[in-house]
Amino acid sequence: IVIRKESYRKFEADKFSLLEEVKQVNIGNARSASLSIGLGLNTATYAQSYNYARVAIDLALARGGDQAVVKDCHGITYFGGKKEQTSKNTRVKARVKAEALREFIVAKDQVIIMGHKIADADCLGACMGIYRAAKELEKKAHIVMNEVTSSVRPLYDEIAESPAYEKDIFLTSEQAMDYINDNTMVVVVDTNKPQMTECPELLKKTKTIAVLDHHRQSSVGIENAVLSYIEPYSSSSCEMVAEVLQYIVDDIRFPNVEADCLYAGIMIDTQNFMNRTGVRTFEAAAFLRR
């Protein structure tokens, strides 16, 4: 759809009120309708405007929909997106992403996992889940963690001091840069912003990067990822990883401390299952309790 600039200015002036108006449409539908809009502006050609619009609509959908995203040569602007995310019960997407992740891991000799800086329980839990997947597929695995906060210290110490784990399960950024090679895959969890990761430099050292995150897609994302699983509907990254694990390895079993890490991540991010909790959240928790 091509619109005049003056029409866009009207939409901009009323903050894309159309997004709210469409929710009032009721023709017997059980759920309220929502709208996602992507616009490309201020370019030299229609083709470039179209490309900007495609990027904008993809970004709007990745962030959960119900919003307008406008991209031009100066940057990206967001409108709307106030609707609380509702869980999708289908597991098709999780299964497809899990199978793809498995294939990428199998193709490499080593997996380096990292989350965001100043890791919380959800970040550590998701890291441990991917670590377990890599180990079950008989791959070397390491987790990048520079600063250990008090919120994850007990679990971190239990893992680091356990003889069941390698001494180099946890690496600093400097150590990770020494470990990485051409046969290394990097998996980023609980963030999709490159500068928020524990070691942004790692992202430039490998061509095989996977991203799993429950936060809305950032306008400055990890562009060279071969696999991106961004699910704003999930309560936590631990919920996503717990679900993915069930498709990567059949009848997977892992130590209690790893289950505790994943369960703690879900508990903290949902505030004891009080917020942003759906059917799949409880199913992930039940899987971990088993």
What does each of the following model-derived ranges do?
Residues 169-224:
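Active-site cofactor/cluster-binding pocket
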Residues 1-9:
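Short beta-strand->loop micro-motif that forms the acidic, two-metal-ion catalytic signature
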Residues 54-55, 128-133, 160, 202-205, ...:
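Short, solvent-exposed amphipathic alpha-helical segments in soluble enzyme
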Residues 12-23, 42-65:
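Catalytic-core segments of nucleotide cyclases and related cyclic-nucleotide turnover enzymes
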Residues 108, 112-182:
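Anionic-ligand anchoring segments at beta-strand to alpha-helix junctions in alpha/beta enzyme folds, i.e.
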Residues 95-98, 105-119, 126-139, 219-290:
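A structured phosphate/pyrophosphate-recognition subdomain
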Residues 1-2, 28-54, 67-72:
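A short glycine-enriched loop-to-beta-strand structural element that forms part of the catalytic core
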Residues 47, 72-108:
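C-di-GMP signaling machinery
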